[in-house]
């Protein structure tokens, strides 16, 4: 081990920073966040650095460095572009046995700064010992995606109850077992879900010896339009801790593969007028699985609250007192339009956008047509393929120009994406001619003409 990792309490301690430029500013921000009192020495000091020092109760010395500047300082930072000066500062600090860091010069350092993941009070440090700082930063970036920001709140919860638990369990092994149970169970789940008051109530009940009810939880997760890279960090984390996954037809196989390997997978997909599993049965499955203590991911394509019937499902959960979380996803309109190079709004073409379902609960296409032909408006139709001839006919009948630019986006955001553009009157012909099938999004509006300039993503199937 080249360096021993330690965490230094700098709160209220004087730290000397030699240098007044951008590098000194970056180091000083980190030190100020840790509560250090800054003493910055340089002939010239950037305005932002001066403001930072003033806000932290430190001092700026507009002159060259002198060894006496080390007096009373518990840490020294040399952050200038003068190698000789940096070496001089390092030698002075070593002679006084004061920890010193020289930026980009590991050989002159007695301490080095790691790459930091801050989930205060939880802190994770990654270091390559100065040999590969870029690699350390890349690893930190990966850890940032694995550890949610709410883990800091979880550590804070433990801190508030630490003394109670220590009094209850004098034995170290007992305390460790208690906290392991807390951090891997429903108490942690409540805190990570942002339900701090409920987490505190459950933890106090556990300390008081009350029996824990083993109700599971349901995570209603939006899987986005198809590209796995469009999943949120939160969605991925919950998918990887679920015991059971109930998934729809529109969830891409590549996304399903990101779920926990040993999770039970249950297909509950639906097509128009062909529901593999009726909605009320899906609702009951969610309730039953949660009551059995399972952590259940209900995985839906796009966003669960935009034509996804997510509201119906969590109404049922709420009626049975089942804990749930909702994780929004990128809806098909946003994702598919972006990957097709079609901005849904544009100052010159559309000041509003309207998301419309292509068929209603009873299977009809009875829509408020007079509202849908307003000028400077983009229309996006979900599930509109079957009713497309009626949609085009009614829009034209109610005043939308037959030559209005329009697009069909099949399997948007995936390698199988196909995009067909034409006019509103052309759409039914394009569907028949190119054998377009679901899932396909329909966009109507002047913004479609921008695709010719803005298209950037080309799926394996090409576009017309």
UniProtKB/Swiss-Prot annotation:
Binding site for NAD(+): 22-23, 43-44
Cystine bridges: none
Residue positions where Phosphoserine is found in the record: 128
Pathway assignment: Cofactor biosynthesis; adenosylcobalamin biosynthesis; precorrin-2 from uroporphyrinogen III: step 1/1; Cofactor biosynthesis; adenosylcobalamin biosynthesis; sirohydrochlorin from precorrin-2: step 1/1; Porphyrin-containing compound metabolism; siroheme biosynthesis; precorrin-2 from uroporphyrinogen III: step 1/1; Porphyrin-containing compound metabolism; siroheme biosynthesis; siroheme from sirohydrochlorin: step 1/1
Keywords noted in UniProt: Cobalamin biosynthesis, Lyase, Methyltransferase, Multifunctional enzyme, NAD, Oxidoreductase, Phosphoprotein, Porphyrin biosynthesis, S-adenosyl-L-methionine, Transferase
Keyword check for NAD: yes
Gene this chain is encoded by: cysG
Protein name according to UniProt: Siroheme synthase
Region (Uroporphyrinogen-III C-methyltransferase): 216-464
Biological process annotations from GO: cobalamin biosynthetic process; methylation; siroheme biosynthetic process
């Amino acid at each position: 081990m080249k360096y021993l990792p330690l965490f230094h309490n700098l709160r209220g301690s004087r730290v000397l920073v030699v240098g007044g430029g951008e590098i000194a500013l970056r180091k000083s921000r980190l030190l100020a966040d840790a509560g250090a009192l800054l003493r910055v020495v340089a002939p010239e000091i950037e305005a932002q650095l001066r403001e930072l020092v003033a806000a932290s109760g430190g001092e700026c010395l507009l002159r060259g460095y002198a060894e006496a500047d080390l007096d009373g300082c518990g840490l020294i930072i040399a952050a200038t572009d003068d190698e000789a000066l940096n070496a001089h500062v390092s030698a002075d600090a070593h002679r006084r046995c004061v920890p010193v860091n020289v930026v980009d010069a590991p050989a002159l350092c007695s301490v080095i700064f790691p790459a930091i993941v801050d989930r205060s009070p939880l802190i994770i440090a990654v270091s390559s010992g100065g040999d590969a700082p870029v690699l350390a930063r890349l690893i930190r970036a990966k850890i940032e995606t694995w550890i949610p920001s709410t883990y800091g709140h979880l550590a804070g919860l433990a801190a508030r109850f630490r003394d109670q638990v220590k009094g209850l369990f004098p034995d170290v092994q007992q305390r460790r077992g208690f906290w392991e149970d807390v951090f891997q169970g429903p108490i942690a789940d409540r805190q990570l879900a942002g339900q701090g008051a409920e987490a505190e109530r459950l933890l106090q009940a556990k300390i008081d010896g009350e029996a824990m009810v083993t109700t599971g939880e349901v995570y209603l997760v939006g899987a986005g339009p198809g590209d796995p890279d469009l999943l949120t960090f939160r969605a991925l984390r919950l998918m990887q801790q679920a015991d059971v996954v109930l998934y729809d037809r529109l969830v891409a196989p590549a996304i399903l593969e990101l779920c926990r390997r040993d999770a039970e997978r249950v297909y509950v997909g639906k097509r128009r007028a062909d529901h593999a599993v009726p909605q009320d049965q899906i609702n009951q499955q969610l309730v039953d699985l949660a009551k059995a203590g399972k952590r259940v991911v209900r995985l839906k394509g796009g966003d669960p609250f935009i034509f996804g019937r997510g509201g119906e499902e969590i109404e049922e959960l709420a009626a049975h007192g089942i804990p749930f979380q909702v994780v929004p996803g990128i809806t098909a309109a946003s994702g598919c339009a972006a990957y097709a190079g079609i901005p849904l709004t544009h100052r010159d073409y559309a000041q509003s956008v309207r998301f419309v379902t292509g068929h209603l609960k009873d299977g009809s296409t009875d829509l408020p047509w007079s509202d849908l032909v307003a000028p400077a408006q983009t229309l996006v139709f979900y599930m509109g393929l079957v009713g497309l001839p009626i949609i085009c006919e009614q829009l034209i009948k109610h005043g939308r120009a037959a030559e209005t630019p329009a697009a069909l986006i099949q399997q948007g955001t995936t390698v199988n994406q196909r995009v067909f553009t034409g006019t509103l009157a052309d759409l039914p012909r394009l569907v028949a001619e190119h054998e377009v099938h679901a899932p396909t999004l329909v966009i109507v509006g002047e913004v479609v003409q921008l695709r010719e300039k803005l298209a950037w993503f080309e799926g394996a199937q090409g576009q017309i």
